[in-house]
Structures are given as C-alpha cells and as structure tokens.
C-alpha cells in the first residue's frame, strides 16, 4: 500500500483542488472516464442489489456525475453529494439524471433515516483522513460521516466505498470508525498483486454480518487487470450481454460469473450447465 509521491489530498482542501480545470478533466479525459466507470461497475456488483428492480442509491463524492451515469444506465435512481461546486457545475452541464447536493461528507449526510437502498463512493473517503484546518479531527469527521450514512440506509443495505488509502494505518482508522458507527463488513482488494490495477473497496453492511465478497484476480478478469487499456471495449461488451438469448448456455454462464463477482455461492460449471431438462412423465 505504498503511497504515491504526490497525492491530491496533500494539495489542500478538496473544494479547492477540484476546481474548474480539474472538473474539465473528468468530462473530457477518456482515460479517467473509463477508470471511473469500471470502478462504479464493480461497486454496483458488490452492492448485490436485487435483480430486475430499480433501487434508490446515494453517491458520495459524485463529482461530475460519471458514476451516476452508469447507475442510471443500470436502471437505478440516485442522489449525489459533493463538496466541489466546480464538479457539480460540470455534472449540471452534462444533464445528469440524478439529484445533486453541495455538502461536506465529513459533517454527515443530511438525509432521513432509511432513505437509500445502497451507497457507493469512488475515490472520496480518503479525503476525510486529512485535517485542512485546526478544527478538523479526522477520526471525528469519519465517525460523523459513517454514523449518518448508517442511519440513511435501509436496514440490511450495503455501502461500497472505493478508496485509495495512503497506508495501513489510514485504512485501519477508516474501518475502525465505520465499525464504531454500527457497520459490519470489511475490505475487498481487487488484483492485489498488480501495482497499477490494485483497488480497495470498503464493503459495509448495515444489517447482520454476511460473508465478504472475494476480490478479483488477474485470472478472473483480465480486462480489468490493467489500467493501460483505455478503449471503448466496454460498450460492445454491454451490448453483447444484452443480446444473449435468455436461458441459453451463454446467458446462464454470464449470470453465474456475475454472481461470483458479487461474492455469492455458485455451483461449479459443468458440461450440463445451461442444458434444458428432458420432460418427465
């Protein structure tokens, strides 16, 4: 978990770092858009939302609405909160479908109890570990965030927070405050042996503790194992998935693989997978 030489959190408060120039990158830079979309896709997988029905989700640190676009594509509704006016302006210019709120997650999420079916956050939570003024106490701000988030979720819902911890001490600080607020769960690490593609997802449960999903490895998903491949390959993949004949062998295999990525128990594939049963008399 080696820290980079120059982390954005060390440059100052997020509302100043994410100015108009930075917001422009999140709208025009195809590389950043691709990475953000893939991490959002993975976060939704880990949420394990009910299939075939829309959910109401909260996006913490929504920025220019890139994650929200994917949420909308999947048929869900969302509300986004961000501390940067420039990023929210970029989201408005892009006509994102979700509702947007300017706010500091370190002061809590201002929603009624049980408002959301789930929560995602991409590359935001680690900002709470830095004190930009004397009154900022990271542990206190983290607890305020997690306790208010716990309240805003329906009982049994999940929150999946992708983050870039600077070191193991910072990750422990975050998980400790989440547990103190009432959450169960843990950290899922995708591609742990890859320096570039390694990703941390804090998977939190607001109900009884369940088995933690397993992290992806290079052998499971080679396309996601490298951040150097930034093309439009994902779009035809989604189209191909929609074109699969329902109940066909390919459709069944794709559905089973998706459930494995969500951490669910799935029976092994065999030569009989996807075969129709013969009628019995």
Swiss-Prot record:
Family designation: Belongs to the class I-like SAM-binding methyltransferase superfamily. BUD23/WBSCR22 family.
GO cellular component, one term: nucleolus
General function of this protein: S-adenosyl-L-methionine-dependent methyltransferase that specifically methylates the N(7) position of a guanine in 18S rRNA. Requires the methyltransferase adapter protein TRM112 for full rRNA methyltransferase activity. Involved in the pre-rRNA processing steps leading to small-subunit rRNA production independently of its RNA-modifying catalytic activity. Important for biogenesis end export of the 40S ribosomal subunit independent on its methyltransferase activity. Locus-specific steroid receptor coactivator.
Principal EC category: transferase
Subcellular location: Nucleus; Nucleus, Nucleoplasm; Cytoplasm, Perinuclear region; Cytoplasm
InterPro entries linked: Bud23-like, Bud23_C, Methyltransf_11, SAM-dependent_MTases_sf
Presence of keyword Mitochondrion: no
A biological process from GO: positive regulation of rRNA processing
Catalyzed reactions: a guanosine in 18S rRNA + S-adenosyl-L-methionine = an N(7)-methylguanosine in 18S rRNA + S-adenosyl-L-homocysteine
Keyword hit for Nucleus: yes
Organism of this sequence: Mus musculus (Mouse)
Biased composition (Polar residues): 212-231
Gene: Bud23
Reported modifications of this chain: May be ubiquitinated and targeted to degradation in response to pro-inflammatory cytokine signaling.
Binding partners and assembly: Heterodimer with TRMT112; this heterodimerization is necessary for the metabolic stability and activity of the catalytic subunit BUD23. Interacts with GRIP1.
UniProt-recorded Gene Ontology molecular function terms: protein heterodimerization activity; rRNA (guanine) methyltransferase activity
Name of the protein this chain belongs to: 18S rRNA (guanine-N(7))-methyltransferase
Amino acid composition bias (Basic and acidic residues), ranges on this chain: 242-256
EC number per UniProt: 2.1.1.-
PANTHER family registered for this protein in UniProt: 18S RRNA (GUANINE-N(7))-METHYLTRANSFERASE-RELATED (PTHR12734:SF0), METHYLTRANSFERASE-RELATED (PTHR12734)
Stretch list, region Disordered: 212-281
UniProt keywords, alphabetically: Chromatin regulator, Cytoplasm, Methyltransferase, Nucleus, Ribosome biogenesis, rRNA processing, S-adenosyl-L-methionine, Transcription, Transcription regulation, Transferase, Ubl conjugation
Chief place where the protein resides: nucleus
């Amino acid at each position: 978990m080696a820290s980079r030489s120059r982390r954005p959190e060390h440059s100052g408060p997020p509302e100043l770092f994410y100015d108009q120039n930075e917001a422009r990158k999140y709208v025009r830079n195809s590389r950043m858009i691709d990475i953000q979309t893939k991490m959002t896709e993975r976060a939704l997988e880990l949420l394990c939302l009910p299939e075939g029905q829309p959910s109401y989700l909260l996006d913490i640190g929504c920025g220019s609405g890139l994650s929200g676009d994917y949420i909308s594509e999947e048929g869900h509704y969302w509300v986004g909160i961000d501390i940067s006016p420039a990023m929210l302006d970029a989201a408005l210019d892009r006509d994102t479908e979700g509702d947007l709120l300017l706010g500091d997650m370190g002061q809590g999420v201002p929603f009624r109890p049980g408002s959301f079916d789930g929560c995602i956050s991409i590359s935001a939570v680690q900002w709470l570990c830095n004190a930009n003024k004397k009154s900022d106490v990271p542990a206190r701000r983290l607890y305020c965030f997690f306790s208010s988030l716990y309240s805003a979720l329906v009982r049994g819902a999940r929150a999946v927070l992708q983050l870039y911890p600077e070191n193991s001490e910072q990750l422990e600080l975050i998980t400790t405050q989440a547990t103190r607020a009432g959450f169960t769960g843990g950290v899922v690490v995708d591609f742990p042996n890859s320096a570039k593609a390694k990703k941390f997802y804090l998977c939190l449960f607001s109900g009884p503790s369940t088995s933690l999903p397993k992290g992806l490895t290079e052998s499971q998903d080679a396309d996601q194992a490298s951040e150097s491949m930034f093309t439009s390959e994902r779009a035809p993949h989604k189209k191909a998935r929609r074109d699969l004949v329902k109940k066909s062998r390919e459709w069944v295999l794709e559905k089973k693989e998706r459930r494995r990525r969500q951490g669910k128990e799935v029976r092994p594939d065999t030569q009989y997978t996807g075969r129709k049963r013969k009628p019995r008399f």
